Amino acid sequence: MSLSTKREHSGDVTDSSFKRQQRSNKPSSEYTCLGHLVNLIPGKEQKVEITNRNVTTIGRSRSCDVILSEPDISTFHAEFHLLQMDVDNFQRNLINVIDKSRNGTFINGNRLVKKDYILKNGDRIVFGKSCSFLFKYASSSSTDIENDDEKVSSESRSYKNDDEVFKKPQISATSSQNATTSAAIRKLNKTRPVSFFDKYLLGKELGAGHYALVKEAKNKKTGQQVAVKIFHAQQNDDQKKNKQFREETNILMRVQHPNIVNLLDSFVEPISKSQIQKYLVLEKIDDGELFERIVRKTCLRQDESKALFKQLLTGLKYLHEQNIIHRDIKPENILLNITRRENPSQVQLGPWDEDEIDIQVKIADFGLAKFTGEMQFTNTLCGTPSYVAPEVLTKKGYTSKVDLWSAGVILYVCLCGFPPFSDQLGPPSLKEQILQAKYAFYSPYWDKIDDSVLHLISNLLVLNPDERYNIDEALNHPWFNDIQQQSSVSLELQRLQITDNKIPKTYSELSCL
């Protein structure tokens, strides 16, 4: 690949074919560095400075600002447009890339089909098939600049960039060039907010839900592996909401508890002229969900369920003390941090499986309504109500008692493998079963379960929130102290023989369908 321009820039690595044209009458000294295109082709490890001019043209024509002479490059292949956006109360200078070519412009392996794509830090951009670059915005501080230059100057290493591994090229520059570039960058980016893509490298997808997808990511400086929840795009038309998002995430980042997934960082990122995405950076828990454990084992032992459930209640107690109501407690939102046994002499710290030393419960997705909008969040809950309290379904006022109802459903599922409310147990319908608190402990599934557990569940799955256990009553229940409850379960909640046509399928059985 050959690349040329018509005027040298201080701060760029240059050779006889690496020059730059200024098409504006504005003196070049008045332009400042907005970012760089770093050449990824072996043997062509140079970087092109992209300034804050209104339009930068790329193509084979000698009138282009950046000239690429490969045969698959169009005469006018692409344009970089300076885009100034007010996002999260910051004026951001961004680059909007527009494809003008026949052979395409590709961002991270995907062909650019829309005319409105905002480049992000670390994007890999390929013009045609032959010209491959890594794009980097200029850093917001001299420290960041030095770190970036040091990284790029070091030996080529392999990095994950969303969908593939690429080489980070070797680049060197003189100290005087670095000083000139750094001064220009500081002038432009004095108030530039830190972007998610400044701090993290995105990796593989971990999962997807109603509101967002979750990806793996790595902190560029520390190497820490994290999970990032990327919410679906929304209109950038309400700066008040963006400010509220920032304030609320700052509050949630102060939530620190052993049984809560830590929120580490948050970002608002523009993705087009009119749309933004919100990013939440979270502690990464590697050992799966409570739901997966139930599916794998069909149901959990009583001692195992007790140890996990007490941790769940302890985490909920902390959230409620911080005036945070979860409202979406379910096995998929209960993550497990498992310490594996490395040798037979290690002593177990709980009633776990043979290969496990200890398990720590981590509650995820607390405060989600703050990021999705109250109405959307509630409507989604009502659409999949298996664990939702009756007062949420009726959209009446509610308290932290909604989390105690959901916890009761989880304990029920842990011990028998299927939920107390389901369409399999109808009629009535699933929703009506919840609204009537109509459930039972069916034989033979509950025959060997202690009465004390039935008493606890029956005081959590209470229709009237005022009569439902609060968090302290649940934590102080005799079951946790191995005290048997005598004659405590009402007659209608005794173990009932289920009819053959209503035998429920466990989550394990349903997962095999």
Curated annotation (Swiss-Prot):
Residues 56-112 form the FHA domain. ATP binds at L206, G207, A208, G209, H210, Y211, A212, L213, V214, K229. One of its GO terms (molecular function) is protein serine kinase activity. Keywords: ATP-binding, DNA damage, Kinase, Nucleotide-binding, Nucleus, Phosphoprotein, Serine/threonine-protein kinase, Transferase. CDD domains: FHA_DUN1-like, STKc_CAMK. The active site is at D328. Its EC number is 2.7.11.1. GO terms for cellular component: nucleus. The keyword Aminoacyl-tRNA synthetase does not apply. The modification Phosphoserine is found at S10, S139. Residues 1-12 have a biased composition (Basic and acidic residues). InterPro entries: FHA_dom, Kinase-like_dom_sf, Prot_kinase_dom, Protein_kinase_ATP_BS, Ser/Thr_kinase_AS, SMAD_FHA_dom_sf. Changing K229R: Loss of kinase activity. SMART domains: FHA, S_TKc. Changing D328A: Loss of kinase activity. Residues 1-29 are annotated as: Disordered. It is found in: Nucleus. Residues 200-480 form the Protein kinase domain. One of its GO terms (biological process) is DNA damage checkpoint signaling. Autophosphorylation increases in response to DNA damage. Its main location: nucleus. Transducer of the DNA damage signal. Phosphorylates SML1 on serine residues. Cooperates with the PAN deadenylation complex in the regulation of RAD5 mRNA levels and cell survival in response to replicational stress. Present with 3480 molecules/cell in log phase SD medium. Interacts with the PAB-dependent poly(A)-nuclease (PAN) complex regulatory subunit PAN3 via its forkhead-associated (FHA) domain. This is DNA damage response protein kinase DUN1.
